[in-house]
Regions:
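Conserved phosphate/oxyanion-binding catalytic-loop motifs
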Residues: 48
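Asp-based, Mg2+/Mn2+-dependent phosphohydrolase catalytic module
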Residues: 2-29, 34-37, 54-73, 77-80, ...
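Conserved nucleotide-binding/hydrolysis micro-motifs of P-loop NTPases
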Residues: 51
Length: 258
C-alpha cells in the first residue's frame, strides 16, 4: 500500500484518533508535530461540541501539541458562520455553557429566537430539557444541530451521543434539524475549501465509519479508518469500506513520507 504523491493534505478527527477521553493515543502527537515540521497541510475536523476551539487548542497543548486555532474546524464555527450569513442573530443555544464564548456576537433568547441550536448536553439531556427544547423550537425559523452522532465513548464504553436526542426532537416536531458537523457535505466542503486542494488529494483520517468515513466518501475524499477509538464497535456498518485501514494515526508516516 502506498499513498505517496497521491495525498497533499489531511483532515484529522480528534477524539479516538489523536486522543481518547483526554489521553493521547501513542504516536499521534509526534506525528502531527512532524506534519508541522515539514509544513504538510492538515486540519482537525471534529464534532466536539462540549468546548470552544480555544479550549480544544489548550487541551492539545497540555498533550504536547501547540496548534493554530484556525486549524480546528468544529460544528460551532460552522453554525456561527451559517447564522451570520442568514442574518439570524437571536438564538436559543442548548449546549455546554463553555461554548457560549463562540457565540458572543449573538443574542441568547429562549423565548422567541430566530434559530434553535442543539449541542451535546451529556447528562443534562432529561425529559424536562428535551421538552423545553421542543417547546422553544415550535416557533423558530431555523433548527440547527451541531451533529447527529449516534454513539460516542463515555468512561471507556460506547454510549449514546447527541444524534438520538436530535432524532427524538425531529420526530416530535415533524421537522429536520440542519446538520452543521460531520457527516454533512456542508461541513466537509468548508474544510476542503479551507485547504484549497482537489478532493482526491485529501485524506480524511477517522475512527468512526458512519461520521468520518461515509461523510468523507459522500464528497469523494480518500478515507483512512484507524483501529483506535470506536474501531470495532460499529459492527452494524460493515457495508462502509474506507480506502485504507491502519493501526493508528502515526502509521501514516511511513506510508506517506518514507
Amino acid at each position: 500500500m502506498t499513498l505517496k504523491r497521491k495525498i497533499k493534505a489531511l483532515l484529522i478527527d480528534l477524539e479516538g484518533v489523536v486522543y481518547q477521553e483526554g489521553k493521547k493515543i501513542p504516536g499521534s502527537i509526534s506525528f502531527i508535530q512532524y506534519l508541522e515540521k515539514i509544513n504538510f497541510p492538515y486540519l482537525f475536523l471534529t464534532n466536539t461540541t462540549t468546548m470552544p476551539r480555544k479550549d480544544i487548542a489548550n487541551k492539545l497543548l497540555k498533550l504536547g501539541l501547540k496548534t493554530n486555532i484556525n486549524k480546528i474546524i468544529t460544528p460551532l464555527i460552522a453554525a456561527k458562520n451559517y447564522l451570520k450569513k442568514n442574518h439570524h442573530f437571536s438564538i436559543a443555544l442548548y449546549c455546554n455553557k463553555r461554548c457560549y464564548v463562540d457565540f458572543q456576537d449573538f443574542q441568547i433568547n429562549f423565548q422567541s429566537p430566530d434559530a434553535v441550536i442543539v449541542g451535546d448536553l451529556y447528562k443534562k439531556f432529561s425529559w424536562e430539557k428535551l421538552n423545553e427544547i421542543f417547546l422553544t423550537s415550535l416557533n423558530s425559523k431555523k433548527l440547527i444541530a451541531f451533529h447527529k452522532n449516534k454513539t460516542g465513548t463515555r468512561k471507556g464504553s460506547i454510549a449514546l451521543d447527541l444524534g438520538p436526542f436530535v432524532k427524538a426532537l425531529e420526530y416530535a416536531l415533524d421537522n429536520d434539524f440542519i446538520l452543521m458537523g460531520k457527516p454533512s457535505k456542508f461541513f466537509f466542503q468548508a474544510a476542503v475549501d479551507h485547504l484549497g486542494f482537489n478532493k482526491k488529494e485529501i485524506l480524511m483520517v477517522g475512527d468512526d465509519k458512519e461520521v468520518d468515513i461515509r461523510g468523507a466518501q459522500n464528497l469523494h475524499l480518500q478515507t483512512c479508518l484507524v483501529k483506535t477509538g470506536k474501531y470495532g464497535k460499529q459492527i452494524y456498518l460493515k457495508s462502509i469500506e474506507p480506502s485504507y485501514i491502519l493501526p493508528k494515526l502515526s502509521s501514516l508516516k511511513s506510508i506517506l513520507f518514507q
